[in-house]
Amino acid sequence: MASMQEVDALVVGAGFGGLWMTNRLKEAGLNVLCVEKAPQAGGVWYWNCYPGARVDSRYPVYQYSDESLCKDWNWSELFPGYEEIRKYLSYAVDKWQLNSHIRYNTTVTGARFDESDHKWTVEGINGSHGTIRIRCRWYILALGFASKPYIPDFEGLNRFQGPCFHSSAWPQEGIDLKGRRVAVVGTGASAVQIIQTISKEVGHLTVYQRTPCTAMPMRQQSLTPEYQDNFKASGEMAATMRRTKYERFGGQDVQFVSRRWHEDTPEQRRAVFEQAWQKGGFHLLLSTYFEVFDDVEVNHAAWRFWAEKSRERIHNTKYKDILAPLEAVHAFGGKRTPFEQDYFEAFNRRNVDLIDMKASPILSFAEKGIITQNEGLQEFDVIILATGFDTNTGALTSIHIQDTDGILLKDRWSYDGVMTTFGMSTSKFPNMFFFYGPQAPTAFSNGPSCIELQGEFVEELILDMIGKGVTRVDTTSEAEKRWKESTLSLWNQFVFSSTKGFYTGENIPGKKAEPLNWFGGFPRYRKALTECRDGGYKEYSLRSLPKVPDPEHRGLIDKVAVVTSAQPVGA
């Protein structure tokens, strides 16, 4: 039988959210353990190591707001790549002295709550010690919103004899693509970065597209240490971090123009779009007119502007209509809008072909390649599946987590749809919290900013409960219903609600179609969390363990002693 380990709090995941929460609870005096599937910190930035992988959030917001970290760290680029993010997170682990609190190579497989002592028993597999069991009062899941890859059920997928893998399973040691025949299936955010990078070195690249990708210019720049040192010394960096975290809609340092679309002339509208386009990044979506979100006419105008600008860069007339059709095929922004550096130019290369899967769907995979309706067999040496993720809920429901009735989380949400309070807790799973998941700002926010907002709330809640002697915290079904109504109401106000995709889970066959992100923006989200805390956590049912006589005559004590120390897992 596996040995039992006891801690106050267990954090699952050593990415941005897990490391941040582990540090905060450690600093608060709790005995906290973080477990991570990978052999090092990084979260999704460990697994996503494909060529060109980098953030979509512009410097300085994609980092922790902790000034002690910012002081001694400088970035090399406006949009850092995965290697640099890995180094940054390792730096945070060292700076925060977290190594003794993290167990790597550990996969959590299941968890159940014990009503007798208000603790979770969590089971998993450790690479060195085999099966492990951990007991904790507080169970915190920081798994990332896009950490469960999705691969469509292609006919004959396993027949292909060469390397074939999902973009998030890119070999850590890399793979030599020089001169080889490569296929990329998909044109989402990961595919954009892969295609524009490998097209310069492969012998031949064939891209399989189902839906046009509304990729926008990144406007990448190098950053000098001198610029960053001055930015920090002036106080502007700290001000930017506070502003984006507490005042901006999605945690990005951009904001909409104050004027309405219909107040401007056509020339003024064009000038607003042009200015945003030149700045790049999120500006076309988040610094033009708010009506891009809630007015179909304005949204379609934004699409057409994007299409016209993108088509100027595509030489092949046929490819123009496939990659950037003038008429919107879905709401602009209704699917993720990744940032590119020379994505569209890649299709001007003689060694790059494009197959429109709407006109010529994939029929099957074969030993030597992929068979499509019109082209027949195309032979490849390597196939890359950039086919997306089961976002928001996939990682959570992959773990065998039982509620107080013994029902699995995946079954609860398949019956009722996703039910949460603030996108962080769900009823009948007491003392369990999750970050950057369903019904939170998640996909419409800057990850580190969202994680810190949520983490601050959970930390304060836990410390408040410890101070009051509360041992069981469970959100109410009434609070869940209100939050779900808020999620639905907000989503239905915007033109995105007409678009099928991972924002609603419709990229996964059989998954219930519903909005998986709360679209109210950071200021409103923070206000809701603050009101809950200041109101005494009325959205939660609070209970304490019964007191029993102390056999050593020290008065009344909890029925089960509070754990104050623990040995490392496997010790």
UniProtKB/Swiss-Prot annotation:
Catalytic activity annotation: 9,10-dihydroxy-7-methoxy-3-(2-oxopropyl)-1H-benzo[g]isochromen-1-one + NADPH + O2 + H(+) = methyl 2-[(3S)-9,10-dihydroxy-7-methoxy-1-oxo-1H,3H,4H-naphtho[2,3-c]pyran-3-yl]acetate + NADP(+) + H2O; (3S)-9,10-dihydroxy-7-methoxy-3-(2-oxopropyl)-1H,3H,4H-naphtho[2,3-c]pyran-1-one + NADPH + O2 + H(+) = semiviriditoxin + NADP(+) + H2O
Position of the signal peptide: none
Positions of the record's site feature: Transition state stabilizer: 336
Named cofactor requirement(s): FAD
Highest taxon in the source lineage: Eukaryota
Example GO molecular function: N,N-dimethylaniline monooxygenase activity
Cofactor: how and how many bound: Binds 1 FAD per subunit.
Presence of keyword Cytoplasm: no
Binding site for FAD: 44-47, 56-57, 62
Keyword Cell division attributed: no
UniProt pathway annotation: Secondary metabolite biosynthesis
E.C. number: 1.14.13.-
A Pfam family this chain is assigned to: FMO-like
InterPro entries linked to this entry: FAD-binding_Monooxygenases, FAD/NAD-bd_sf, Flavin_mOase-like
Gene Ontology BP annotations: (M)-viriditoxin biosynthetic process
Binding residue positions for NADP(+): 54-56, 187-193, 210-211
Keywords noted in UniProt: FAD, Flavoprotein, Monooxygenase, NADP, Oxidoreductase
Summary of the knockout phenotype: Impairs the conversion of the ketone group into a methyl-ester group to yield semi-viriditoxin.
Family according to the record: Belongs to the FAD-binding monooxygenase family.
Function text: FAD-binding monooxygenase; part of the gene cluster that mediates the biosynthesis of viriditoxin, one of the 'classical' secondary metabolites produced by fungi and that has antibacterial activity. The first step is performed by the polyketide synthase VdtA which condenses one acetyl-CoA and 6 malonyl-CoA units to form the heptaketide monomer backbone of viriditoxin. The product of VdtA is then O-methylated on C7 by the O-methyltransferase VdtC. The O-methyl group is important for the stereoselective coupling of the monomers at the final step of viriditoxin biosynthesis.
Protein name (Swiss-Prot/TrEMBL): FAD-binding monooxygenase VdtE
Origin organism lineage: Eukaryota, Fungi, Dikarya, Ascomycota, Pezizomycotina
